[in-house]
């Protein structure tokens, strides 16, 4: 998937794009495993050593607030994220 699709998704939901936000959205759009914030951080950190866990958590919160991604709460300790916001079974 090209970064352009992630950028377009951010623009569609009126989220100001940044390098980190585009990378996080791109990861979500490419991985259908409903990753946690830690999984996303661990996947992106080797390519983006300036990325912090706080940035990942804050970015995911913005995505959820704006409706760009879906929050899937398994229990109090396991929040997962899904870029597919159309109704579907989990």
What residue ranges belong to the model's regions?
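Non-DNA-binding regulatory cores of transcription-related proteins
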Residues: 65-90
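Basic amphipathic alpha-helical segments that dock to polyanions
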Residues: 56-66
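Short, Lys/Arg-enriched N-terminal segment that forms or immediately precedes the first helix
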Residues: 2-14
